[in-house]
Amino acid sequence: MEAFQTIHIKADTPYACGVQYGQQAKEKIRAGVEVYRRYFAKTSDKSWDKIQQYAMAYLPDIEQMMPEVLEEAYGVADGAEISIEDLMVLNCRYEITKFPKTPECTTAAILPEATTSHTTYLVKNWDYKQAVIPNIVILHIEQADGTRILGLTEAGQMLREGFN
């Protein structure tokens, strides 16, 4: 297995961060869109246009609650040269595939008092489709205020799992 691609992002605005992300992960983002096109063609009676419409229905809520994330999403789409609709499908795939839903992930913590080294361990597995593995990236983001974030996600998705 290859190492995951690391995307380094440092910009002053969420849109500029998104553009950098989209440009650096363009091929993986486009491959991810194709993974979901094939997946939904096999598992859904809905057309790709209908699936895009479903994903886009989340846009008003995202704009109201997290406008900076939406700004970044537009940047990712522009940087990867894909439509915002395709990017929204990537980011809403959980919601789109929710019913019927099979379990995906397990999260656990081991507290210091339970270990001989008095160390805290955080564990998370990601039980999902093998087809997405080649499109997983590590994001290393440095925000304008100096906040640094490191995380793992499917290319094109806003950060999934991470630390800051």
Segment roles from a protein language model:
Residues 1-164:
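N-terminal mature-domain region immediately after signal-peptide cleavage
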